[in-house]
UniProtKB/Swiss-Prot annotation:
GO terms for molecular function: structural constituent of ribosome. InterPro entries: eRP_eS24_sf, Ribosomal_eS24, Ribosomal_eS24_CS, Ribosomal_uL23/eL15/eS24_sf. Residues 98-126 are annotated as: Disordered. The gene is rps24. The keyword Ribonucleoprotein applies. The keyword Calcium does not apply. This is Small ribosomal subunit protein eS24.
Amino acid sequence: MDKAAVVVRTRKVLTNRLLSRKQFVVEVVHPGKANVSKKDLKTTIAKLHKVADPETIFLFGFKTDFGGGKSTGFGLIYDNLEIAKKYEPKYRLARAGLYTKPQTSRKQRKEKKNRLKKAGKKTAKK
């Protein structure tokens, strides 16, 4: 990431004590460049907010303005990783590499679906 060309700003910083995190809006100005990667943004925001572990930062919901050059998104900084794993949705944890979905076989999924359908018919008759 070229430091001179990219400017990262955080607005509307709120401290959410109930969920043990900081919430903020991230503005990235990147003229003449494609979008900046979230990995680069995490390291920049970690330095900006003096965060020891960049793994506790979650960035999402980025929209690039028409014509490019500026993106706006949302960010969360949790106090520690355990709290982040407790409150973050599983899909965001999976994006960060902190969660893997247990994979069942196709046959098991189909059998479960059919069992549930069968159980639903029995309760509907009564």
